[in-house]
């Protein structure tokens, strides 16, 4: 699932948090090549080149980084802070054998270094545990941060008013996809699910008039 919105689609609450008034959605179950087409088509539809800055928030997955590098090489990429916190916490729990005080201290230190832009200290801290074998079920934090080291300047991102977390995508997964596809007793083929997801994206993007026109033109 991909979400598109601009500064014009947001307003600030009294507590300075942002609310997104309007979002555009694309979604697809299957290979990345088809998803890339949908993402780029939506960006073109929204005339992405007219915006001063193009910003992507993601969980740092390799396929997403590669897709953005290919389609939007000028874009600013942000590693979702809350994914980083979660991965740091899980890594620390393994390293420190569930000692929560040490886990919290380690997590706060890593995130603090991100905010102070002391990336060399992140590398120095993680180097202490380079000989520890990490289970595949746990994020290899040194590799994860090395791959995303140019996407963790959270002080600058927040100063610019950009989102640093993917809460919008997490909540939209529930409202756009799961709310319709995961009701009691439902079973879907991939093809059928993709048809329904497309309709859901059009509905939640306030483009249902386009679906009505397609149906009307087909009937008449």
Predicted regions mapped to residue ranges:
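Catalytic center-proximal scaffold of phosphoryl-transfer enzymes
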Residues: 1-220
């Amino acid at each position: 699932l991909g979400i598109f919105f601009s500064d014009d689609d947001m307003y600030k609450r009294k507590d300075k948090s942002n609310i997104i008034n309007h979002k555009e959605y694309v979604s697809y179950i299957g290979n990345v090549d088809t998803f890339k087409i949908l993402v780029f088509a939506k960006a073109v539809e929204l005339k992405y080149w007219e915006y001063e800055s193009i910003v992507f928030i993601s969980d740092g997955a390799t396929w997403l980084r590669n897709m953005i590098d290919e389609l939007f090489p000028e874009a600013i990429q942000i590693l979702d802070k809350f994914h980083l916190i979660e991965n740091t916490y899980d890594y620390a729990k393994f390293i420190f054998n569930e000692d929560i005080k040490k886990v919290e201290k380690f997590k706060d230190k890593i995130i603090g270094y991100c905010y102070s832009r002391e990336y060399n200290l992140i590398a120095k801290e993680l180097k202490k545990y380079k000989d520890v074998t990490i289970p595949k079920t746990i994020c290899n934090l040194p590799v994860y941060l090395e791959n995303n080291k140019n996407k963790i300047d959270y002080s600058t991102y927040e100063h610019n008013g950009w989102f640093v977390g993917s809460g919008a995508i997490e909540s939209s997964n529930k409202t756009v996809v799961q709310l319709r596809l995961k009701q009691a007793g439902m079973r879907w083929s991939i093809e059928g699910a993709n048809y329904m997801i497309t309709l859901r994206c059009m509905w939640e993007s306030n483009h249902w008039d386009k679906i009505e026109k397609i149906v009307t033109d087909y009937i008449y």
